[in-house]
Amino acid sequence: MLPSLKMLFSLMITLLIFGILFTTLISDVRPAPPPVPLPPALKIPSPPKGCKGCSDVRPSAPPVPLPPALKIPSSDVRPAPPPVPLPPALKIPSRGPLIEKVMARYSQTWKKQEENSTKFRDLLRSTCHGFTKAVVSQDNTPVGAQIVYDGEKRKPLTVTSAFFNTFAKRNPFSNKTWDTCSVVGNGGILSNSNCGEMIDSAQFVIRCNLSPVENSFLKDVGNKTNLVTANPSILIKKFRGLQDRRRPFMESMRRYNDSLMLLPAFSYSGNTEVSLRALYTMEDFESPIRPVFLNPEYLLNLRSFWRLNKRLSSGLMMASLALELCTNVHLYGFWPFDQHPLLHQPLKNHYYDNVQSTKIHAMPAEFDHLLRLHEQGVLKIHLGKCRPSSR
């Protein structure tokens, strides 16, 4: 019996030990934890139906606060320089209504109209008599004749022998005609025109008021001169009326070579003395220039022909003379406005300076007469840049 108890007790001990070991083994083996589920995607609720103006834009994250700005001691703070203003945009001025109307007339295709040209030339010759009366000569103004100043009709001048000897022996234009003539005005429109070569290509070139033809102007106005007018006011302003040194005047006259110099000695009584001094100076210095005097009777005829109340400008006088003397007349530098008709830029009064003209001439009215002749194909006005090969 005892041995059986011992065996039973031993078996129980053995089972107990195995149970402890098994329990320990099971407790050390842990199952892997289940995977952590990812959070569901953020779902933005759609706006309820009927919500007008509601946005489907997701709300932005709150801004990350910036660090506080560095505080600089007030003594070191310098104000920022003001911004440099940008230049204003270039504004091209528009042409005024008057210039628009003028250019509408001028822009028509120009063509020489032989019949119109011949009729007008004949009318001018029969009315103004430039061939025989444009210049005071010994042929048309004898000793004892009365010269009536065209600007002072109440002060006639009796021709003495001394005066008579200063007159041209005969009219330099009698029985002379030229095929092409350039009449060069002094308008600022000639600046940068490149018209010099075309001007000089004419057989006879007329210039006004001792206009400069030095090298700096050669490209635009040329230098050929067959006839030049000399207003006594220029002789007084530039050369002190030739009462002092006369050499500067003669140095200035060299540029005109052997041209005729047309002096309005009998327009006003004050013109006579200074015009005579100019003539005597050129004789004393043996100048090749031939001074002659404009005939006031011819100027009165011109004024009546053009029906202008104001005194005619030198430009219109010379254009009129050219229309009698020349088959083809081309005008340059004739533009009475202060804005370029094609480039829309401001113009100087003259191509060589910006001295304003006096109000004794009716420049726009004169230009209107010349523009009408341009439209009729009687003469041609050149505006803008010239093309020498087109002539």
Language-model regions: role of each:
Residues 2-35, 39-54, 67, 71-391:
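Metal-ion/cofactor- or nucleotide/acyl-coenzyme-handling active-site neighborhoods
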